[in-house]
Protein backbone atom coordinates (compact mmCIF):
# COMPACT_ATOMS: atom_id res chain seq x y z
CA UNK A 1 0.00 0.00 0.00
CA UNK A 2 1.90 3.03 -1.28
CA UNK A 3 -0.58 5.44 0.25
CA UNK A 4 -1.74 4.71 3.78
CA UNK A 5 -4.04 6.38 6.28
CA UNK A 6 -2.47 7.17 9.67
CA UNK A 7 -3.89 8.48 12.92
CA UNK A 8 -2.68 9.00 16.48
CA UNK A 9 -4.89 9.08 19.59
CA UNK A 10 -3.30 10.70 22.64
CA UNK A 11 -4.58 10.66 26.21
CA UNK A 12 -3.21 13.45 28.41
CA UNK A 13 -2.54 13.53 32.11
CA UNK A 14 -4.24 16.46 33.86
CA UNK A 15 -3.72 18.19 37.20
CA UNK A 16 -4.29 21.54 38.91
CA UNK A 17 -1.70 23.24 41.09
CA UNK A 18 -2.50 26.04 43.52
CA UNK A 19 -0.93 27.41 46.68
CA UNK A 20 -4.05 29.21 47.84
CA UNK A 21 -7.11 27.08 47.07
CA UNK A 22 -8.24 23.57 47.89
CA UNK A 23 -6.99 20.74 45.65
CA UNK A 24 -9.14 19.83 42.66
CA UNK A 25 -9.50 16.26 41.43
CA UNK A 26 -8.63 15.43 37.81
CA UNK A 27 -12.36 14.98 37.19
CA UNK A 28 -13.11 18.51 38.41
CA UNK A 29 -10.27 20.03 36.38
CA UNK A 30 -11.37 18.15 33.26
CA UNK A 31 -14.89 19.54 33.61
CA UNK A 32 -13.51 23.08 33.65
CA UNK A 33 -11.27 22.25 30.69
CA UNK A 34 -14.17 20.97 28.61
CA UNK A 35 -16.78 23.53 29.66
CA UNK A 36 -16.31 25.54 26.46
CA UNK A 37 -16.43 22.36 24.36
CA UNK A 38 -19.68 21.27 25.98
CA UNK A 39 -21.18 24.76 25.54
CA UNK A 40 -20.96 24.61 21.73
CA UNK A 41 -20.87 20.87 21.13
CA UNK A 42 -23.43 19.92 23.84
CA UNK A 43 -21.12 17.02 24.63
CA UNK A 44 -17.62 16.28 25.89
CA UNK A 45 -17.14 14.14 22.77
CA UNK A 46 -16.90 16.28 19.63
CA UNK A 47 -15.44 16.38 16.14
CA UNK A 48 -13.68 19.61 15.24
CA UNK A 49 -13.50 21.59 12.02
CA UNK A 50 -9.98 20.25 11.41
CA UNK A 51 -11.44 16.74 11.18
CA UNK A 52 -10.16 15.57 14.56
CA UNK A 53 -11.99 14.17 17.58
CA UNK A 54 -11.66 15.69 21.05
CA UNK A 55 -13.19 14.00 24.06
CA UNK A 56 -12.90 12.98 27.69
CA UNK A 57 -11.75 9.39 27.97
CA UNK A 58 -12.00 6.91 30.85
CA UNK A 59 -10.54 8.38 34.04
CA UNK A 60 -11.11 11.99 32.96
CA UNK A 61 -8.15 12.00 30.58
CA UNK A 62 -8.55 14.53 27.77
CA UNK A 63 -8.00 12.68 24.50
CA UNK A 64 -7.26 14.03 21.05
CA UNK A 65 -7.51 11.80 17.98
CA UNK A 66 -6.00 13.26 14.83
CA UNK A 67 -7.93 13.37 11.60
CA UNK A 68 -7.05 10.83 8.93
CA UNK A 69 -3.63 11.70 7.49
CA UNK A 70 -1.84 10.16 4.52
CA UNK A 71 1.61 11.69 5.03
CA UNK A 72 3.84 11.42 8.09
CA UNK A 73 4.69 15.13 8.17
CA UNK A 74 0.98 15.89 7.96
CA UNK A 75 0.32 13.49 10.85
CA UNK A 76 2.98 15.15 13.00
CA UNK A 77 1.43 18.57 12.31
CA UNK A 78 -2.04 17.38 13.30
CA UNK A 79 -0.74 15.60 16.39
CA UNK A 80 0.93 18.84 17.47
CA UNK A 81 -2.23 20.81 16.64
CA UNK A 82 -4.03 18.77 19.28
CA UNK A 83 -1.63 20.08 21.92
CA UNK A 84 -2.18 23.67 20.76
CA UNK A 85 -5.97 23.26 20.86
CA UNK A 86 -5.78 21.89 24.39
CA UNK A 87 -3.49 24.75 25.43
CA UNK A 88 -6.21 27.18 24.32
CA UNK A 89 -8.73 25.30 26.48
CA UNK A 90 -6.29 25.40 29.42
CA UNK A 91 -6.01 29.20 29.19
CA UNK A 92 -9.79 29.57 29.27
CA UNK A 93 -10.17 27.04 32.10
CA UNK A 94 -7.60 28.90 34.23
CA UNK A 95 -9.48 32.18 33.76
CA UNK A 96 -12.74 30.54 34.78
CA UNK A 97 -11.15 28.82 37.77
CA UNK A 98 -9.64 32.10 38.91
CA UNK A 99 -13.03 33.83 38.71
CA UNK A 100 -14.48 31.09 40.90
CA UNK A 101 -11.77 31.42 43.53
CA UNK A 102 -9.30 28.80 42.32
CA UNK A 103 -6.14 30.72 41.49
CA UNK A 104 -3.60 28.34 40.02
CA UNK A 105 -2.35 26.51 36.95
CA UNK A 106 -3.75 23.64 34.92
CA UNK A 107 -1.12 21.21 33.68
CA UNK A 108 -1.52 18.79 30.78
CA UNK A 109 1.12 16.12 30.32
CA UNK A 110 1.75 14.14 27.15
CA UNK A 111 3.10 11.14 29.02
CA UNK A 112 1.82 7.68 29.93
CA UNK A 113 1.90 7.27 33.72
CA UNK A 114 0.95 9.29 36.77
CA UNK A 115 2.33 9.33 40.30
CA UNK A 116 -0.28 6.80 41.43
CA UNK A 117 0.92 4.24 38.89
CA UNK A 118 -2.02 4.63 36.51
CA UNK A 119 -1.31 4.37 32.79
CA UNK A 120 -2.90 6.12 29.83
CA UNK A 121 -2.00 5.63 26.25
CA UNK A 122 -0.92 6.74 22.85
CA UNK A 123 -2.64 4.65 20.21
CA UNK A 124 -1.53 4.45 16.59
CA UNK A 125 -3.81 3.58 13.68
CA UNK A 126 -2.69 2.24 10.31
CA UNK A 127 -5.03 1.38 7.45
CA UNK A 128 -4.28 -2.04 5.96
CA UNK A 129 -5.94 -4.14 3.29
CA UNK A 130 -8.58 -6.67 4.27
CA UNK A 131 -6.85 -9.42 2.32
CA UNK A 132 -4.21 -11.38 4.16
CA UNK A 133 -4.22 -13.10 7.51
CA UNK A 134 -4.32 -10.58 10.34
CA UNK A 135 -3.03 -13.06 12.93
CA UNK A 136 0.06 -13.70 10.81
CA UNK A 137 0.66 -9.97 10.44
CA UNK A 138 0.43 -9.58 14.22
CA UNK A 139 3.00 -12.36 14.67
CA UNK A 140 5.41 -10.48 12.41
CA UNK A 141 4.83 -7.13 14.11
CA UNK A 142 4.86 -8.07 17.79
CA UNK A 143 8.64 -8.74 18.05
CA UNK A 144 9.24 -5.40 16.36
CA UNK A 145 6.79 -3.59 18.65
CA UNK A 146 8.23 -5.18 21.79
CA UNK A 147 11.70 -3.95 20.83
CA UNK A 148 10.64 -0.65 19.20
CA UNK A 149 11.08 1.14 22.53
CA UNK A 150 14.82 1.27 21.69
CA UNK A 151 14.06 3.70 18.88
CA UNK A 152 10.79 5.32 20.02
CA UNK A 153 10.55 5.14 23.82
CA UNK A 154 9.83 8.33 25.76
CA UNK A 155 12.13 7.37 28.64
CA UNK A 156 11.27 7.27 32.34
CA UNK A 157 12.90 7.21 35.75
CA UNK A 158 11.32 4.14 37.38
CA UNK A 159 11.17 3.96 41.16
CA UNK A 160 11.00 0.56 42.82
CA UNK A 161 11.50 -0.11 46.54
CA UNK A 162 13.67 2.96 46.95
CA UNK A 163 15.79 2.12 43.92
CA UNK A 164 15.66 4.09 40.69
CA UNK A 165 16.66 3.24 37.14
CA UNK A 166 16.21 4.91 33.79
CA UNK A 167 14.17 2.91 31.27
CA UNK A 168 13.45 3.21 27.56
CA UNK A 169 9.66 3.08 27.92
CA UNK A 170 6.90 4.43 30.14
CA UNK A 171 4.28 2.09 28.74
CA UNK A 172 6.17 -1.23 28.88
CA UNK A 173 5.31 -1.92 32.53
CA UNK A 174 1.59 -1.65 31.78
CA UNK A 175 1.22 -4.07 28.84
CA UNK A 176 -0.29 -7.45 29.69
CA UNK A 177 -1.10 -9.25 26.42
CA UNK A 178 0.20 -9.65 22.90
CA UNK A 179 -3.11 -9.27 21.09
CA UNK A 180 -6.58 -8.67 22.52
CA UNK A 181 -9.83 -6.86 21.76
CA UNK A 182 -9.49 -4.85 25.01
CA UNK A 183 -7.66 -1.52 25.34
CA UNK A 184 -7.89 -0.67 29.05
CA UNK A 185 -8.38 -3.88 31.01
CA UNK A 186 -5.61 -6.08 29.62
CA UNK A 187 -3.67 -3.50 27.56
CA UNK A 188 -2.39 -5.58 24.66
CA UNK A 189 0.36 -4.69 22.21
CA UNK A 190 -2.10 -4.82 19.30
CA UNK A 191 -5.83 -4.35 19.68
CA UNK A 192 -7.77 -6.80 17.49
CA UNK A 193 -11.22 -5.23 17.67
CA UNK A 194 -12.32 -5.04 14.04
CA UNK A 195 -13.45 -1.44 13.60
CA UNK A 196 -12.00 -0.27 10.27
CA UNK A 197 -13.86 3.09 10.13
CA UNK A 198 -13.89 2.41 6.40
CA UNK A 199 -15.30 -0.09 3.89
CA UNK A 200 -14.98 -3.32 5.87
CA UNK A 201 -14.82 -5.42 2.71
CA UNK A 202 -11.66 -3.62 1.60
CA UNK A 203 -9.90 -2.41 4.72
CA UNK A 204 -8.93 -3.18 8.26
CA UNK A 205 -7.45 -0.87 10.90
CA UNK A 206 -4.26 -1.92 12.65
CA UNK A 207 -4.62 -0.48 16.15
CA UNK A 208 -1.29 -0.38 18.02
CA UNK A 209 -1.55 0.56 21.69
CA UNK A 210 1.86 -0.39 23.06
CA UNK A 211 3.68 2.85 22.23
CA UNK A 212 4.76 5.76 24.39
CA UNK A 213 3.49 9.28 23.76
CA UNK A 214 6.22 11.23 22.02
CA UNK A 215 7.15 14.88 22.34
CA UNK A 216 9.83 14.72 19.64
CA UNK A 217 8.71 15.14 16.04
CA UNK A 218 11.61 13.02 14.80
CA UNK A 219 10.76 10.20 17.21
CA UNK A 220 7.16 10.24 15.98
CA UNK A 221 8.46 10.18 12.42
CA UNK A 222 10.57 7.12 13.22
CA UNK A 223 7.82 5.38 15.21
CA UNK A 224 5.21 5.66 12.49
CA UNK A 225 7.58 5.50 9.54
CA UNK A 226 9.15 2.17 10.50
CA UNK A 227 5.76 0.48 10.95
CA UNK A 228 4.64 1.82 7.58
CA UNK A 229 7.75 0.42 5.90
CA UNK A 230 7.37 -2.99 7.53
CA UNK A 231 3.69 -3.13 6.56
CA UNK A 232 4.55 -2.20 2.99
CA UNK A 233 7.24 -4.88 2.88
CA UNK A 234 4.91 -7.59 4.23
CA UNK A 235 2.13 -6.50 1.86
CA UNK A 236 4.57 -7.00 -1.02
CA UNK A 237 5.12 -10.60 0.05
CA UNK A 238 8.53 -10.39 1.74
CA UNK A 239 9.01 -13.27 4.19
CA UNK A 240 10.41 -12.53 7.64
CA UNK A 241 12.33 -15.04 9.72
CA UNK A 242 10.36 -16.38 12.70
CA UNK A 243 11.05 -13.99 15.58
CA UNK A 244 8.08 -14.89 17.77
CA UNK A 245 8.97 -14.54 21.44
CA UNK A 246 8.43 -17.14 24.12
CA UNK A 247 7.07 -14.49 26.48
CA UNK A 248 6.69 -11.04 24.87
CA UNK A 249 5.19 -9.51 28.02
CA UNK A 250 8.17 -10.46 30.16
CA UNK A 251 10.53 -9.41 27.37
CA UNK A 252 9.01 -5.95 26.94
CA UNK A 253 9.67 -5.18 30.61
CA UNK A 254 13.20 -6.59 30.66
CA UNK A 255 14.12 -4.76 27.46
CA UNK A 256 12.83 -1.45 28.83
CA UNK A 257 15.09 -1.67 31.87
CA UNK A 258 18.28 -2.43 29.93
CA UNK A 259 19.70 0.55 28.02
CA UNK A 260 22.37 -1.66 26.42
CA UNK A 261 19.71 -3.40 24.32
CA UNK A 262 21.43 -6.69 25.17
CA UNK A 263 19.00 -8.22 27.69
CA UNK A 264 18.44 -11.86 26.61
CA UNK A 265 15.20 -12.50 24.73
CA UNK A 266 14.12 -16.11 24.32
CA UNK A 267 12.22 -16.86 21.14
CA UNK A 268 9.43 -19.40 20.78
CA UNK A 269 11.76 -21.65 18.76
CA UNK A 270 14.25 -21.78 21.64
CA UNK A 271 16.81 -19.38 20.18
CA UNK A 272 18.13 -16.68 22.50
CA UNK A 273 18.74 -13.22 21.06
CA UNK A 274 18.34 -9.61 22.25
CA UNK A 275 16.40 -6.45 21.39
CA UNK A 276 19.26 -4.87 19.47
CA UNK A 277 19.66 -7.93 17.25
CA UNK A 278 15.90 -8.11 16.62
CA UNK A 279 15.77 -4.45 15.61
CA UNK A 280 18.82 -4.94 13.39
CA UNK A 281 17.08 -7.81 11.63
CA UNK A 282 14.03 -5.67 10.81
CA UNK A 283 16.27 -2.79 9.73
CA UNK A 284 18.34 -4.98 7.41
CA UNK A 285 15.23 -6.60 5.93
CA UNK A 286 13.64 -3.22 5.19
CA UNK A 287 16.93 -1.88 3.79
CA UNK A 288 17.15 -4.86 1.44
CA UNK A 289 13.52 -4.39 0.42
CA UNK A 290 14.04 -0.71 -0.39
CA UNK A 291 16.88 -1.54 -2.80
CA UNK A 292 14.28 -2.93 -5.20
CA UNK A 293 11.03 -1.25 -4.10
CA UNK A 294 12.45 2.23 -3.64
CA UNK A 295 11.34 4.97 -1.26
CA UNK A 296 7.63 5.77 -1.49
CA UNK A 297 7.88 9.20 0.15
CA UNK A 298 10.52 11.84 0.80
CA UNK A 299 11.05 11.05 4.50
CA UNK A 300 12.09 7.41 3.93
CA UNK A 301 15.86 8.13 3.70
CA UNK A 302 15.69 10.20 6.89
CA UNK A 303 13.73 7.46 8.68
CA UNK A 304 16.23 4.78 7.67
CA UNK A 305 19.20 6.95 8.64
CA UNK A 306 17.79 7.74 12.10
CA UNK A 307 16.80 4.09 12.65
CA UNK A 308 20.35 2.94 11.92
CA UNK A 309 22.01 5.70 13.93
CA UNK A 310 19.83 4.96 16.96
CA UNK A 311 20.74 1.26 16.91
CA UNK A 312 24.42 2.14 16.48
CA UNK A 313 24.24 4.60 19.39
CA UNK A 314 22.79 1.94 21.68
CA UNK A 315 25.33 -0.65 20.57
CA UNK A 316 28.21 1.77 21.16
CA UNK A 317 26.61 3.17 24.37
CA UNK A 318 27.23 6.68 23.06
CA UNK A 319 23.92 8.53 22.75
CA UNK A 320 25.38 11.88 21.68
CA UNK A 321 24.45 11.31 18.02
CA UNK A 322 20.72 10.97 18.84
CA UNK A 323 20.29 13.28 21.83
CA UNK A 324 18.37 15.83 19.76
CA UNK A 325 16.16 13.32 17.92
CA UNK A 326 15.00 10.44 20.16
CA UNK A 327 12.83 11.23 23.18
CA UNK A 328 14.46 8.89 25.70
CA UNK A 329 17.92 10.17 24.74
CA UNK A 330 16.89 13.84 24.81
CA UNK A 331 15.41 13.40 28.28
CA UNK A 332 18.35 11.34 29.53
CA UNK A 333 20.77 14.11 28.57
CA UNK A 334 18.66 16.59 30.57
CA UNK A 335 18.50 14.33 33.61
CA UNK A 336 22.19 13.40 33.49
CA UNK A 337 23.26 17.05 33.32
CA UNK A 338 21.01 18.13 36.19
CA UNK A 339 21.99 15.11 38.28
CA UNK A 340 25.71 15.78 37.83
CA UNK A 341 25.40 19.53 38.41
CA UNK A 342 23.52 19.06 41.69
CA UNK A 343 25.16 15.80 42.89
CA UNK A 344 21.83 13.99 43.07
CA UNK A 345 20.95 10.32 43.14
CA UNK A 346 18.58 9.09 40.44
CA UNK A 347 15.75 8.65 42.94
CA UNK A 348 15.78 12.37 43.80
CA UNK A 349 12.31 13.99 43.68
CA UNK A 350 13.87 16.85 41.71
CA UNK A 351 14.77 14.47 38.89
CA UNK A 352 11.25 13.02 38.97
CA UNK A 353 9.98 16.58 38.54
CA UNK A 354 12.21 17.11 35.48
CA UNK A 355 11.06 13.77 34.06
CA UNK A 356 7.46 14.97 34.31
CA UNK A 357 8.13 18.55 33.15
CA UNK A 358 9.60 17.22 29.89
CA UNK A 359 6.04 16.17 28.94
CA UNK A 360 4.30 19.43 29.91
CA UNK A 361 2.64 20.62 26.68
CA UNK A 362 2.62 24.31 27.72
CA UNK A 363 4.92 25.89 25.14
CA UNK A 364 6.14 28.57 27.59
CA UNK A 365 6.87 26.13 30.43
CA UNK A 366 7.34 22.53 29.28
CA UNK A 367 10.97 21.45 29.15
CA UNK A 368 10.70 19.91 25.69
CA UNK A 369 9.40 23.18 24.26
CA UNK A 370 12.08 25.19 26.04
CA UNK A 371 14.65 22.94 24.35
CA UNK A 372 12.87 23.45 21.04
CA UNK A 373 13.04 27.24 21.40
CA UNK A 374 16.80 26.93 21.97
CA UNK A 375 17.19 24.81 18.84
CA UNK A 376 18.26 21.83 20.96
CA UNK A 377 15.88 19.33 19.36
CA UNK A 378 15.50 18.32 15.73
CA UNK A 379 12.32 19.13 13.81
CA UNK A 380 10.33 17.62 10.96
CA UNK A 381 7.91 20.54 10.46
CA UNK A 382 7.82 24.29 10.87
CA UNK A 383 5.61 25.83 13.58
CA UNK A 384 3.23 27.20 10.96
CA UNK A 385 2.19 23.71 9.86
CA UNK A 386 0.81 22.83 13.30
CA UNK A 387 -0.83 26.24 13.61
CA UNK A 388 -2.58 25.76 10.27
CA UNK A 389 -3.73 22.29 11.34
CA UNK A 390 -5.69 23.77 14.26
CA UNK A 391 -8.32 24.95 11.78
CA UNK A 392 -7.67 23.11 8.52
CA UNK A 393 -8.23 19.36 8.05
CA UNK A 394 -5.85 17.27 5.93
CA UNK A 395 -6.82 18.25 2.38
CA UNK A 396 -5.99 14.86 0.87
CA UNK A 397 -8.24 12.51 2.88
CA UNK A 398 -11.85 12.02 3.98
CA UNK A 399 -11.12 14.42 6.85
CA UNK A 400 -11.49 17.29 4.37
CA UNK A 401 -15.15 16.35 3.88
CA UNK A 402 -15.82 16.04 7.59
CA UNK A 403 -14.09 19.30 8.40
CA UNK A 404 -15.93 21.19 5.68
CA UNK A 405 -19.28 19.81 6.87
CA UNK A 406 -18.63 20.56 10.55
CA UNK A 407 -17.56 24.12 9.77
CA UNK A 408 -20.56 24.74 7.51
CA UNK A 409 -23.07 23.26 9.97
CA UNK A 410 -21.65 25.32 12.83
CA UNK A 411 -21.74 28.50 10.74
CA UNK A 412 -25.36 27.82 9.80
CA UNK A 413 -26.28 27.07 13.41
CA UNK A 414 -27.63 23.65 12.47
CA UNK A 415 -27.85 20.57 14.64
CA UNK A 416 -25.69 17.75 13.31
CA UNK A 417 -24.08 14.44 14.25
CA UNK A 418 -20.67 13.31 13.01
CA UNK A 419 -18.43 10.29 13.47
CA UNK A 420 -15.52 8.88 11.45
CA UNK A 421 -17.76 7.66 8.60
CA UNK A 422 -21.14 9.44 8.98
CA UNK A 423 -22.19 13.04 8.36
CA UNK A 424 -25.75 13.65 9.50
CA UNK A 425 -28.08 16.64 9.73
CA UNK A 426 -30.51 16.26 12.61
CA UNK A 427 -33.44 17.70 10.66
CA UNK A 428 -36.80 16.18 9.83
CA UNK A 429 -35.31 14.19 6.97
CA UNK A 430 -32.25 13.07 8.99
CA UNK A 431 -30.10 13.52 5.92
CA UNK A 432 -27.02 11.31 6.24
CA UNK A 433 -23.97 10.72 4.07
CA UNK A 434 -21.87 7.61 4.61
CA UNK A 435 -18.19 8.21 3.76
CA UNK A 436 -16.62 4.76 3.62
CA UNK A 437 -13.55 5.64 1.55
CA UNK A 438 -10.93 7.32 3.79
CA UNK A 439 -8.88 8.35 0.74
CA UNK A 440 -11.73 10.27 -0.89
CA UNK A 441 -11.54 14.02 -0.31
CA UNK A 442 -14.34 15.12 -2.67
CA UNK A 443 -17.94 13.92 -2.69
CA UNK A 444 -20.95 15.38 -4.48
CA UNK A 445 -23.26 14.01 -1.77
CA UNK A 446 -21.40 15.99 0.89
CA UNK A 447 -21.49 19.10 -1.29
CA UNK A 448 -25.26 18.69 -1.64
CA UNK A 449 -25.64 18.20 2.11
CA UNK A 450 -23.70 21.39 2.78
CA UNK A 451 -25.68 23.26 0.12
CA UNK A 452 -28.90 22.25 1.85
CA UNK A 453 -27.79 24.09 4.98
CA UNK A 454 -28.72 27.34 3.31
CA UNK A 455 -32.19 26.18 2.23
CA UNK A 456 -34.61 27.11 4.98
CA UNK A 457 -37.36 24.83 3.62
CA UNK A 458 -35.15 21.83 4.22
CA UNK A 459 -35.24 22.33 7.99
CA UNK A 460 -37.90 22.50 10.63
CA UNK A 461 -37.68 25.42 13.04
Swiss-Prot record:
Q: Does the keyword Lipoprotein apply?
A: no
* InterPro entries linked to this entry: Pup_ligase (IPR022279), Pup_ligase/deamidase (IPR004347)
Residue positions annotated to bind Mg(2+) are: 9, 55, 63
> Which Pfam families does the entry link to?
Pup_ligase
Q: Which GO terms describe its molecular function?
A: ATP binding; ligase activity, forming carbon-nitrogen bonds; magnesium ion binding; ubiquitin-like protein transferase activity
Q: Which residues bind ATP?
A: 53, 66, 420
Record key words, sorted:
ATP-binding, Ligase, Magnesium, Metal-binding, Nucleotide-binding, Ubl conjugation pathway
Q: Which reaction does it catalyse?
A: ATP + [prokaryotic ubiquitin-like protein]-L-glutamate + [protein]-L-lysine = ADP + phosphate + N(6)-([prokaryotic ubiquitin-like protein]-gamma-L-glutamyl)-[protein]-L-lysine
* Pathway(s) this gene product operates in, as recorded in its UniProt entry: Protein degradation; proteasomal Pup-dependent pathway; Protein modification; protein pupylation
Q: What is the role of this chain?
A: Catalyzes the covalent attachment of the prokaryotic ubiquitin-like protein modifier Pup to the proteasomal substrate proteins, thereby targeting them for proteasomal degradation. This tagging system is termed pupylation. The ligation reaction involves the side-chain carboxylate of the C-terminal glutamate of Pup and the side-chain amino group of a substrate lysine.
Any further remarks?
Answer: The reaction mechanism probably proceeds via the activation of Pup by phosphorylation of its C-terminal glutamate, which is then subject to nucleophilic attack by the substrate lysine, resulting in an isopeptide bond and the release of phosphate as a good leaving group.
- Assigned protein family: Belongs to the Pup ligase/Pup deamidase family. Pup-conjugating enzyme subfamily.
Q: What is this protein called?
A: Pup--protein ligase
What lineage is on file? Bacteria, Bacillati, Actinomycetota, Actinomycetes, Micrococcales
